[in-house]
Regions:
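"Short basic amphipathic alpha-helical interaction patches in structured regions
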Residues: 2, 15-17, 81-84
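Predominantly extracellular/luminal cell-surface or secreted proteins
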Residues: 4, 19-21, 140, 217
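Short aromatic-acidic-glycine turn motif
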Residues: 19-35
């Protein structure tokens, strides 16, 4: 994942959250959320946070940083020489403390939430969905508290599954800095699950395990400086 500073100011990554939203795969059969939530939340399956004390990880205007699932050179013989990915220059990674995917030199993202708990769970590696995932980055305003592990008001189950004990983090829309939604392919254009106020459209690469990704389109501002289009 590549995060850009699309502003004219130095921004700090410290304390910014990253979440993949549910459903992890695009579907027209959407979850049912509490009626009282209205349109005020996005719902996170797993949540991470950038480390730092507030000013440790600056991002200058026009700069970007990379967060890798596994910040190694995936083309090494011990992994997959046919892989298109060399993640060894990544600044951050989602380290799951799995000896099969040992901790790399990149800074570790801090794990915040999964299935209602702070623990990472038993899944061996954090993976990006190849079937069209949806993601947000967000920041909790100064003076506000957001704790989906210990605050019952900040997590919920999918009410279409009455006996479910799988919890999702309620992410206030007002906290969200940016969102991206992908689907499997163009046949899933009617399967949007991210609120339009966060991402009005959807996109896709059209195939699985094809070595392709998605990116914002480049443009320029009034002074001719390069910017990333929303």
């Amino acid at each position: 994942y590549e995060i850009y500073n699309n502003s004219a100011d130095i921004l700090y990554l410290d304390g910014i959250y990253f979440a993949n939203l549910t459903p992890g795969t695009a579907t027209t059969k959407l979850p049912i959320w509490p009626e009282a939530d209205g349109n005020n939340y996005a719902y996170g399956e797993r949540v991470w946070k950038f480390p730092g004390n507030g000013t440790e990880y600056p991002l200058a205007p026009g700069e970007s940083c990379i967060i890798s699932q596994f910040a190694a050179n995936h083309q090494l013989d011990i992994y997959n020489p046919q892989s298109p990915i060399d993640g060894s220059s990544s600044e951050f990674e989602f380290n799951m403390n799995n000896p099969n995917f040992p901790d790399q030199a990149a800074y570790d993202m801090q794990h915040v939430f999964y299935q209602g708990k702070a623990e990472m769970g038993s899944i061996p590696q954090y993976l990006t969905s190849v079937f069209g995932g949806a993601y947000v980055i967000f920041r909790v305003p100064e003076g506000e508290a957001w704790d989906p592990v210990n605050d019952e008001n900040m997590k919920t189950t999918d009410l279409s599954k009455p006996n479910s004990n799988v919890y999702y983090a309620k992410i206030p829309i007002k906290y969200v800095l940016d969102a991206v939604e992908a689907v499997n392919n163009e046949s899933k254009m009617n399967a949007k699950r991210v609120p339009g106020v966060l991402d009005a459209g959807i996109t896709w690469v059209g195939a699985t395990y094809c070595g392709l990704g998605i990116a914002r389109k480049l443009s320029t501002d009034e002074e001719g400086n390069p910017i990333i289009r929303e």
